[in-house]
UniProtKB/Swiss-Prot annotation:
Gene Ontology terms: biological process: intracellular protein transport; intracellular transport; proteasome-mediated ubiquitin-dependent protein catabolic process; protein ubiquitination
Role, per record: Substrate-recognition component of a Cul2-RING (CRL2) E3 ubiquitin-protein ligase complex of the DesCEND (destruction via C-end degrons) pathway, which recognizes a C-degron located at the extreme C terminus of target proteins, leading to their ubiquitination and degradation. The C-degron recognized by the DesCEND pathway is usually a motif of less than ten residues and can be present in full-length proteins, truncated proteins or proteolytically cleaved forms.
UniProt keyword Cell membrane, yes or no: no
Pathway membership: Protein modification; protein ubiquitination
Domain of life: Eukaryota
SUPFAM superfamilies: TPR-like
Record-linked Gene3D superfamilies: Tetratricopeptide repeat domain
Originating organism: Rattus norvegicus
Protein name as it appears in the record: Amyloid protein-binding protein 2
Compartments (UniProt record): Nucleus; Cytoplasm, Cytoskeleton; Membrane
Record note on quaternary structure: Component of a CRL2 E3 ubiquitin-protein ligase complex, also named ECS (Elongin BC-CUL2/5-SOCS-box protein) complex, composed of CUL2, Elongin BC (ELOB and ELOC), RBX1 and substrate-specific adapter APPBP2. Interacts with APP; APP interaction inhibits the E3 ubiquitin-protein ligase activity of the CRL2(APPBP2) complex.
Keywords: Cytoplasm, Cytoskeleton, Membrane, Microtubule, Nucleus, Protein transport, Repeat, TPR repeat, Transport, Ubl conjugation pathway
Length: 585
């Protein structure tokens, strides 16, 4: 008789045993807690797979149980799945654990140092997990409790612990946009480092300086951010955790991008991507972090198509790890929305960009307060997309509705930015510039002019006369003067200035030049200068040929499969370039 193919595959003996334990969960609940952490986790994961989230939630909300589960390090990816499912289900497990840990710390305030040290270690692991999972407020509560324990003993071990606490605290405050608290956290860390120095001890400063760089970058203090990234790079040594090295390389790359030091930025971020994938694997959240920053680099060097692909890869990883309504997923959606908007700007096909922008806003509004700063950038991106959809819309009523929605989003973003950063800030200036463009679309030309001039003035004072951001605003004001206010002489000067900056920073094939060239062709047609019309038609044709050749083959992910240099060589190359150039600020 011929062999018949099995219609089911038998479970392994181990999986059968796990299933049997789960089937008898109510009776064996207490016994489960005495199992080794890996086996205990597998039981809980089976509960998750069977959709028994209430029972799983009751287990994970107990600090002792969850602390033990956290020790199953090779299951972290799966733990994120379970945890996010509970949060999506409405089980506030992050808040419950943070509160339980905080209470425990208050109970043991009078206990001996060994008890406190054990609690601090638990806090670091718990807070680290909550931070990695994006639950920053709860992680902050945990790290503050750890810091409080550290201050109870004025001795060297606890000074080291306090420094580590401050670094972690600064990271979660940066992630949660609590920038006003960030600087005091850094100063506290420096106080403990000074104490250690006086006793002949040194704590590595790479992670601390890297987090300070992230804080300053978020506040658009780019010169200061760059300076501290250089200091962080000096602190990279062979014994540092790979995670710290990767994060410092990422921050340094971003600082180089905004300083328009693209060669340095490329070397740093490509090595960070390679290092993260090599050490953590291609499905790890840390790898997705590096991809987002790689996408940022590619977008800024005008390799927009590859930027979209990289952002999509980062989103795919974050969705596979976290899924659901998670802040890490939201930020990836937002980055992909903006790059898709830029990529499809000429075609006018904004469905994909709008989808990702709305997903980002939907997630953020679900898990964070409605006045959270993270909403400012997501709303800004959606507003930009709606404006372009409105411009292409043939129904006047729909056009007005979309423009008004975009206006409300831009105003909301501007208020959030001003509240966080004040008037004199690059982020605030960007929002003024966006409003200027919108007012032009709404045919409110004087208001548009006022907004553009305000944006240019702030950007010039903060970034200098020849920055990319300045060129953008100058080009937008030129467009207003050319298309709607008939101020051709002013428009011509501004177009030529915008073109000069774009060529200097990005070369002859820069994508943004198209709009300036087309603007000049229209301008010279309007003024009857047909010789110039012919000249710029030729310039535009040459530009199109350059664009066809640019970035036609390169696969950005293939480009980082290996690294031609070691980490030490990358760091030394960067630092040597600083010595050659001298101080940057």
């Amino acid at each position: 008789m011929a062999a018949v193919e099995l219609e089911w595959i038998p479970e392994t003996l181990y999986n059968t045993a796990i299933s049997a334990v789960v089937d008898n969960y109510i009776r064996s609940r207490r016994d489960i807690r005495s199992l080794p952490e890996n086996i205990q986790f597998d039981v809980y994961y089976k509960l998750y797979q069977q959709g028994r989230l209430c029972q799983l939630g009751s287990e994970f909300c107990e600090l002792e149980v969850f602390a033990k589960v956290l020790r199953a390090l090779d299951k972290r990816h799966l733990l994120h799945h379970c945890f996010q499912a509970l949060m999506d289900h409405g089980v506030k497990v992050a808040s419950v654990l943070a509160y339980s840990f905080s209470r425990r710390c208050s109970y043991i305030a009078e206990s001996d140092a060994a008890v406190k040290e054990k609690a601090i270690q638990v806090g670091f692991v718990l807070g680290g997990f909550l931070s990695d999972a994006g639950w920053y407020s709860d992680a902050e509560k945990v790290f503050l409790s750890c810091l409080q324990l550290c201050t109870l003993h004025d001795e060297m071990l606890h000074w080291f612990r306090a420094v580590e606490c401050c670094v972690r605290l600064l990271h979660v405050r940066n992630g949660n946009c609590k920038y006003h608290l960030g600087e005091e956290t850094f100063k506290l860390a420096q106080t403990y480092m000074d104490k250690l120095s006086k006793h002949g001890q040194q704590a590595n400063r790479a992670a601390l300086y890297g987090e300070l760089c992230a804080l300053l970058f978020a506040k658009s203090h780019y010169d200061e951010a760059y300076k501290w990234c250089v200091e962080a790079m000096k602190e990279i040594t062979s014994g540092l955790p790979v995670k710290v090295v990767v994060d410092v390389l990422r921050q340094a790359s971003k600082a180089c991008v905004v300083k328009r030091e693209f060669k340095k930025a490329e070397q740093l971020i490509k090595h960070a991507v390679y290092l993260a994938r090599d050490h953590f694997g291609s499905k790890h959240p840390k790898y997705s972090d590096t991809l987002l920053d790689y996408g940022f680099y590619l977008l800024n060097v005008d390799n927009i198509c590859q930027s979209v692909a990289i952002y999509q890869a980062a989103l795919d990883i974050r969705q596979s790890v976290f899924g659901g309504k998670n802040i890490h997923v939201a930020t990836a959606h937002e980055d992909l929305a903006y790059s898709s908007y830029v990529h499809q700007y000429s075609s006018g096909k904004f469905d994909n960009a709008l989808f990702h922008a709305e997903r980002a806003i939907g997630i953020i509004t679900h898990i964070l307060p409605e006045d959270h700063l993270l909403l400012a950038s997501s709303k800004r991106v959606k507003a930009l997309i709606l404006e372009e959809i409105a411009i292409d819309c043939h129904n006047k009523e729909t056009e007005q509705r979309l423009l008004q929605e975009a206006h409300d989003l831009h105003l909301s973003s501007l208020q959030l930015a001003k509240k966080a950063f004040g008037e004199f800030n690059v982020q605030t200036a960007k929002h003024y510039g966006n409003l200027g463009r919108l007012y032009q679309s709404m045919r409110k030309f004087k208001e548009a002019e006022e907004m553009h001039i305000k944006a240019i003035q702030i950007k010039e004072q903060l970034l200098g006369q020849e920055d990319y951001e300045v060129a953008l605003s100058v080009g937008h004001l030129a467009s207003l003067y050319n298309y709607d206010m008939n101020q051709y002489e002013n428009a011509e000067k501004l177009y030529l200035r915008s073109i000069a900056i774009g060529k200097k920073l990005f070369g002859e094939g820069y994508s943004g030049l198209e709009y300036d060239y087309r603007g000049l062709i229209k301008l010279y047609n309007s003024t009857g200068n047909y010789e110039k019309v012919f000249e710029y038609h030729n310039v535009l044709s040459n530009w199109n040929r350059l664009r066809d050749r640019q970035y036609s083959v390169t696969d950005a992910l293939e480009d980082v499969n290996s690294s031609p240099q070691s980490t030490e060589e990358v760091v030394q190359s960067f630092l040597m370039s600083q010595n050659v150039e001298g101080p940057s600020c």
